[in-house]
Amino acid sequence: MDRYDLFEVAAARREARALPYAGALTPVEAYQLLSEGSAVIVDVRTRPEWEFVGHVEDAPLIEWKSYGAPHPDPAFVDKLAARFPKDAAILLLCRSGVRSHHAATAAAQAGFTRVYNVLEGFEGDQDEEGRRGTLGGWRHAGLPWTQH
């Protein structure tokens, strides 16, 4: 699939799921767009997750919520806008796709026109034993990542 097809698939998911942002992509689709230089990826997890669990190489960290914080960072959208134009294709990634959904919603409400959620996130959903990394996600898909 080329980038135009991938963006169309993401938009079709937006329509099917009534998403308030440009669309949603699987980790493999997101990686293809990154590899082609058609989009940027932003990690919205907490700094401890980014440092200790691992992250997509060269993905900037802009926390949606800081570790232990009960509410999203009120400056999240401003931090995103300080790094990227509002018409950039931005892929948001969290642990399982939930926080990045909320971050994408906030970004779209602030005028970002091409913000996408990466479904399944970095680690995916929990399996029957409560573990992550076995049911989807960036790492489970075998995509490149790093850990410091």
Predicted segments with their positions:
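Rhodanese-like catalytic fold shared by cysteine-dependent sulfurtransferases
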Residues: 1-39, 47-89, 100-148
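Short, surface-exposed ligand- or partner-binding patches at beta-edge/loop junctions that are enriched
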Residues: 92-93
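Conserved G/P- and acidic residue-centered "switch" motifs that form tight phosphate/ATP-binding loops
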Residues: 43, 97
